């Protein structure tokens, strides 16, 4: 909903700040206007060490998202805001207008027409221990591990002008390190559990290699005892299962065992573990 718009007003410590909320429509207009102004002074994309800074593409991407939300059922003539303390115009647009969907489409097209963003598709490992090895879905992996703030060193920039960054409109990148692995990795790989783990319901959403749901593919029959076989390549780059091979402490052949019982490790967990 709407918030107090301060604009370029500068307050001193003892000044009374504006606290009255502006309407939802005014807030949308303010965000869009500011992004349009900023986009005129920013490059479409950055590269190298400047990856992660705001760009014209990021401004247009934010406008696109704002316009999509604005046109959605939640804000476009919603039923929220029926009390005098919270009038509708603070929560969204009081009346539905289908032209807001046209504005959302146009905003999305503005991003597409930049011709700088694409799905980074590469099925050959570019670096690491096995450069040149066939690995379906390697491009999906590269998006999350390109921490050198440069282009993936595989000549991909010939096809993708900014390497694996071609898929990112606006990202926040930490420096090199193992923060992500510590949050989400298995305990034997240095994981601390603070980031949480994937749920089985989400695991089941990954299709088979032919795009069909598990249990519906004739070419890739699903075996619950071997859940990773025949799955979409993104499965192996997202999910850790019993028998996964993951880099750990320089060991590229480290095997993760999640089973309980004889020989179980700190990676083991029981049924129903959240």
Where are these regions (language model features)?
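Aromatic- and Gly/Pro-rich amphipathic surface segment
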Residues: 268-272
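Aromatic-anchored glycine-rich loop motif in surface-exposed flexible loops
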Residues: 1-56, 65-96, 274
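An aromatic- and glycine-enriched ligand-binding surface/loop that stacks and positions planar moieties
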Residues: 36, 53, 57-60, 67-267
């Amino acid at each position: 909903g709407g918030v107090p718009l301060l604009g370029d007003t500068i307050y001193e410590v003892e000044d009374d700040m504006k606290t009255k909320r502006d309407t939802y429509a005014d807030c949308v207009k303010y965000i869009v206007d500011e992004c349009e102004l900023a986009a005129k002074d920013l490059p479409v994309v950055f590269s190298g060490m400047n990856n992660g800074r705001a760009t014209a593409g990021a401004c247009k991407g934010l406008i696109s998202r704002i316009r999509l939300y604005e046109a959605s059922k939640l804000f476009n003539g919603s039923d929220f805001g029926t009390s005098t303390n919270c009038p509708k115009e603070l929560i969204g647009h009081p009346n539905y207008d289908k032209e807001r969907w046209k504005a959302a489409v146009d905003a999305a097209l503005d991003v597409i027409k930049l011709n700088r963003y694409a799905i980074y598709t590469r099925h050959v490992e570019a670096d690491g221990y096995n450069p040149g090895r066939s690995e379906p879905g390697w491009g999906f992996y590269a998006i999350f591990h390109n921490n050198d703030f440069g282009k993936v060193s595989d000549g991909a920039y010939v096809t993708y002008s900014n390497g694996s960054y071609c898929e990112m409109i606006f990202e926040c990148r930490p420096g090199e390190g193992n923060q992500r692995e510590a949050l989400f990795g298995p305990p034997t790989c240095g994981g601390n559990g603070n980031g949480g783990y994937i749920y089985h319901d989400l695991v089941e959403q990954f299709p088979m290699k032919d795009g069909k749901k598990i249990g519906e593919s004739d070419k890739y029959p699903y075996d619950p005892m071997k859940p990773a076989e025949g799955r979409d390549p993104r499965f192996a780059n997202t999910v850790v299962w019993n028998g996964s091979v993951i880099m750990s402490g320089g060991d590229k052949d480290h095997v993760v065992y999640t089973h309980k019982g004889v020989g179980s490790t700190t990676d083991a967990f029981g049924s129903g573990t959240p």
